[in-house]
From Swiss-Prot:
Major localization class: cytoplasm
Naturally occurring in which organism (per UniProt): Loxodonta africana (African elephant)
Protein name according to UniProt: Testin
Domain PET, chain residue ranges per copy: 92-199
GO cellular component: cytoplasm; focal adhesion
Amino acid sequence: MDLEARVKKMGLGHEQGFGAPCLKCKEKCEGFELHFWRKICRNCKCGQEEHDVLLSNEEDRKVGKLFEDTKYTTLIAKLKSDGIPMYKRNVMILTNPVAAKKNISINTVTYEWAPPVHNQALARQYMQMLPKEKQPVAGSEGAQYRKKQLAKQLPAHDQDPSKCHELTPREVKEMEQFVKKYKNEALGVGDVKLPQEMDTQGPNRIYIPGGDRSTAAAVGAMEDKSAEQKGTQYSCYCCKLSMKEGDPAVYAERAGYDKLWHPACFVCSACSELLVDMIYFWKNGKLYCGRHYCDSEKPRCAGCDELIFSNEYTQAENQNWHLKHFCCFDCDNILAGEIYVMVNDKPVCKPCYVKNHAVVCQGCHNAIDPEVQRVTYNNFSWHASTECFLCSCCSKCLIGQKFMPVEGMVFCSVECKKMMS
């Protein structure tokens, strides 16, 4: 791809969702404007998933690319126009007759995603076993939850070098090898089946004693298959509780079909969120979402949210950073060798801290420098100096002394408090 085409593609990416309102900040945000490399809105600092952006096509392209060159190509279709793989997510529409007095109306429910099984009754049962707030019914809280989890669990920049910020050719090659490896070794999609249909063997199949099997009648007779199934219990690999007879279970091929999960238990072992569209990554006996699987393999930059493929990076505040991305969260100035303050786990340079975040002294009403000592009581602060931390009545210095706080004022004695009341 030539330079002009790459710049055009980057521009189109930054136009995606431009101006969309923030669902979290409401009117405080002027509208979505993607930061050049942070994956957040420049105006309100929230992620794109927090904004009312129509991303269905973009998300289908992302998941389609994830399944490309894997055994899950049946879940994608390539567009004739540009050959880009698109995720063929299964949309389920249910029509339920609803009696209203004498008239009968039709209530239609559309699920933006449903497990790709031929038995719609099984898919319906699966959905009913999910928490209501996580059922992806179109226009509901559950649909919004699915949208957020697609963005959070399967970041496009964890699989597509073109979605990353200025990777070197060596980093691009290393990332492509990493993606190929996890597609071959970890990526999977859950299957929804009835446990009784599976010839399951292993620790999740528990036989209940059904009498003395050593009798002559038992030794010579053929066992009735249905009776055997009734004498079998299946336990969830996550919660260890038994499955109810007739309830669907989720299987993960990479884990082996001796393991099964309740639909609501098929979650990431790191974040405990429902694995979106049952897309999982299997490692060391645990299920992961895409994000946390990658986190277990590579350091992630706390600035741009991308995986780090460079040999050189920095660590600060128990987080990892590209050298070029260890910047002030407010002004983007590089912080190497500079004084900074952590604000909500984000580094902020000293000038921006004083301007935007510093607490104000109740004595002099000026911002308190982060390197200066201060006295704090409840939500009020003072410079720890003889000029500021004084009795609000007689101006006696209160450093090291007992004091009486009253609505932002401090007094050295009951008498001074009474004089000001």
